[in-house]
Design a protein with these regions (language model features):
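Ribonuclease/tRNase effector modules and their secretory precursors
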Residues: 1-167
Length: 167
């Protein structure tokens, strides 16, 4: 049996370490033992985050919605309530404050971990507006590891304050 983390502060620290590793250039990082409540669905309590690209991972979420949404999806991973699961697809959906995180069971030999593979923001799509006197220099939005770091540190700091206020 892997390490289980039941304390909110310890869960937060494990996720901060994983996200910091990704911001610093690692392609994927696992926050071990943060969701022991997922074990009955076939995996461990480990959740793996991947940087990804335009089609998957944290980059995909940030590229589509920005760093604040990435932070809120990560918050759903940390403290979200299980709202549904699919035995066929081997997925579990967690919900927190209007954000959903979809975790898929990922098998690496005998290692079973949950991989953040989807998300949902319960808000309609909206086009961004820009007020500038010059033409855009990029044809599409950009998102970087430093954007991830700035956005998620803000969200994780807010969550840390909540945890500290409740202890």
């Amino acid at each position: 049996m892997k390490n289980r983390i039941n304390n909110s502060g310890d869960k937060l620290r494990a996720v901060e370490i994983a996200i910091t590793e990704i911001v610093n250039g690692t392609e994927e990082s696992t926050a071990g033992g943060i969701r022991p409540d997922l074990e009955p669905y076939g995996g461990t309590g480990d959740v793996t985050f991947i940087w990804g690209d335009k089609k998957k991972g944290l980059y995909h979420i940030g590229y589509r919605r920005g760093p604040d949404v990435v932070g809120n999806v990560i918050k759903a991973v940390i403290r979200g309530e299980i709202i549904r699961n699919s035995d066929v697809k081997k997925t579990v959906t967690l919900s927190d404050n209007g954000y959903e995180a979809v975790l898929s069971l990922d098998l690496h030999g005998t290692n079973q971990t949950w991989l953040l593979t989807g998300w949902k923001e319960n808000a309609p799509d909206a086009d961004g507006e820009v007020s500038t006197q010059s033409d855009a220099t990029q044809t599409e939005p950009t998102f970087s590891r430093s954007d991830l770091g700035a956005g998620t540190s803000k969200i994780l700091s807010e969550l840390a304050r909540e945890v500290n206020n409740n202890t």
